Curated annotation (Swiss-Prot):
Protein name as annotated: Sodium/potassium-transporting ATPase subunit beta-3
Free-text note regarding domains: The C-terminal lobe folds into an immunoglobulin-like domain and may mediate cell adhesion properties.
Topology class, membrane: Single-pass type II membrane protein
Cytoplasmic side: 1-35
Cystine pairs: 128-144, 154-170, 191-250
Physiological role: This is the non-catalytic component of the active enzyme, which catalyzes the hydrolysis of ATP coupled with the exchange of Na(+) and K(+) ions across the plasma membrane. The exact function of the beta-3 subunit is not known.
Sites where a glycan is attached: 124, 158
Tissue: Expressed in distal colon, proximal colon, ileum, jejunum, stomach, liver, lung, kidney, spleen, and heart. Expressed in the brain, testes and anterior prostate (at protein level).
Residue numbers spanned by region immunoglobulin-like: 186-279
């Protein structure tokens, strides 16, 4: 048996050149121009068909969707609650009354958040009568004014620091928006402290009331200029309190369909936060 002779570099190079282009058969990379044309045509038609099929299925799906109202809304039967400003760590508002730098961010966030609620920003909105639902047929939807004065001591009008410098900090509570939600009753926000005799809790508007005139909400695109109703929670620590640390829990009350208890979601319709005010 003879050993296979090893090809020289020049032989290998010649074979590669012949593979790349064979002048005798006119093949390029082992295929004739006709063969290359057919295979390119096949893949062009194949991937073109896939792209067309994908585009068609997406178009069909988009025809079933409404650009203004979500198609499926049954998974969100009742709204949750959110607080503002958002603290940097969890839901703990920790600051020092004697150091403005520690609560500067809270104050700035509140001012920026409440700018759309100013009289100037709402001059083109509707002054709706209170106490009743504001049903609208469209296609044009009016947005009701929410006067920032309803927040009273937490409006930033009389106290530009929103009570933080006096040990009476304000936190805004808002209910998540759900399109075409209609409360069955008169909703309001109640807040309690888990610790006794440390701080008093005051809500604005009075009794934490959320007026029915802000319902129903018709969606961001249809209900242009909508102002979400707010409830301000002011934590008033006693002047002689040695410990200025309290946990507040707020929840939705006053209606039969806005829930604040759920075995699967313990935060449905409620929110809990802590306020720690150092001297």
């Amino acid at each position: 048996m003879t050993k296979t002779e090893k090809k020289s570099f020049h032989q290998s190079l010649a074979e590669w050149k012949l593979f790349i282009y064979n002048p005798t058969s006119g093949e390029f990379l082992g295929r004739t121009s006709k063969s290359w044309g057919l295979i390119l045509l096949f893949y062009l038609v194949f991937y073109g068909f896939l792209a067309a099929l994908f585009t068609f299925t997406m178009w069909v799906m988009l025809q079933t969707l409404n650009d203004e109202v979500p198609k499926y809304r049954d998974q969100i039967p009742s709204p949750g609650l959110m607080v503002f400003p958002k603290p940097p760590t969890a839901l703990d508002y920790t600051y020092s009354m004697s150091d403005p730098h520690t609560y500067k961010k809270f104050v700035e966030d509140l001012k920026n958040f409440l700018k759309p609620y100013s009289v100037e920003e709402q001059k083109n909105l509707t002054d709706c009568p209170g106490g009743a639902l504001f049903h609208q047929e469209g296609p044009d939807y009016s947005a009701c004014q929410f006067p920032v004065s309803l927040l009273q001591e937490c409006s930033g009008v009389n106290d530009s620091n929103f009570g933080y410098s006096k040990g009476q900090p304000c936190v805004l509570v808002k209910m998540n928006r759900i399109i075409e939600l209609v409360p069955d009753g008169a909703p309001y926000i109640t807040c309690i402290t888990k610790e006794e005799n440390i701080a008093n809790i005051v809500t604005y508007p009075d009794d934490g009331l959320i007026d029915l005139k802000y319902f129903p909400y018709y969606g961001k695109k249809r209900h242009v200029g909508y102002r979400q109703p707010l409830v301000a929670v002011q934590v008033i620590f006693g002047a002689d309190a040695t410990k200025k640390e309290v946990t507040i829990e707020c929840q939705i009350d006053g209606t039969r369909n806005l829930k604040n208890k759920n075995e699967r979601d313990k935060f449905l319709g409620r929110v809990s936060f802590k306020v720690i005010a150092h001297a």
